Amino acid sequence: MAKASETKTVTVEQIGSPIRRPGDQRATLVGLGLNKRHRRSTLQDTPAVRGMIAKVQHLVRVVADE
């Protein structure tokens, strides 16, 4: 099992507006910790988070993979 200091993270930035988007996409942005354009959120790099990023890939961009 990986130690806490070895946990990989991914930083995402919201580049698109949630206005006129389906509710599930808005909820996904909230789940990623984003709500306004150009805000950044650093999250643990897990399959669930990667799936959320893929779902709203037109609204976010990956800034850094660590």
UniProtKB/Swiss-Prot annotation:
Annotated GO MF terms: structural constituent of ribosome
Record keywords, A-Z: Ribonucleoprotein, Ribosomal protein
Biological processes, Gene Ontology terms: translation
InterPro entries with a match to the protein in the record: Ribo_uL30_ferredoxin-like_sf (IPR036919), Ribosomal_uL30_bac-type (IPR005996), Ribosomal_uL30_ferredoxin-like (IPR016082)
Domain of life (superkingdom): Bacteria
A Pfam short name: Ribosomal_L30
GO cellular component: cytosolic large ribosomal subunit
Signal peptide: none
UniProt family annotation: Belongs to the universal ribosomal protein uL30 family.
Assembly with partners or alone: Part of the 50S ribosomal subunit.
Protein name: Large ribosomal subunit protein uL30
Species annotation: Azorhizobium caulinodans (strain ATCC 43989 / DSM 5975 / JCM 20966 / LMG 6465 / NBRC 14845 / NCIMB 13405 / ORS 571)
